[in-house]
Amino acid sequence: MYSNELVVKMLNYIDDNLYKRITMDEISSIFYFNKDYLMRIFKKELDITIMDYINKRRIFNSLELLKNTDDLVIKIALNSGYSSLEYYSETFTKILGVSPLTYRKFTKVNSQISDKELEIIRTRLPDISSLLKRIDIYKNNIKRSEVKKISLFK
């Protein structure tokens, strides 16, 4: 199996299980490769670690829940695959530069949010969006190359 095919399979597994607890030991046992090898090829192919990818996907997915529901932040955290509110809030703040509650305020009409917080949100959100677009392009390119390989052997 080529490393890029393996990375696509890992991406698909992660995306399908994003709301569950995912560990490197689990990924390693599913794909029958050493976890260090899997982490290395993932980073080499995508220029992001597996755990960073998982956290950014989870946080990005939680943005819609914060924006469009009145659910408690702990409920959103648990529904996004985090085991605790503290870890979710810490990860959210690390990635976006503001807390989940500050982001929620930002999305509400007539919100009271400082210019500094607003600027932080505006500069960091495109980074996550571009990462996810880059991952989709990567997956599509691998799929296209697989189709070409198959047609060459017909």
Predicted feature locations:
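Short hydrophobic/aromatic patch on the recognition helix
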Residues: 38, 42, 87-88, 92
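Short coil turns linking two alpha-helices in DNA-binding domains
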Residues: 30, 34-35, 83-84
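Terminal helix-turn-helix DNA-binding modules in bacterial transcription factors
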Residues: 8-16, 21, 25, 44-83, ...
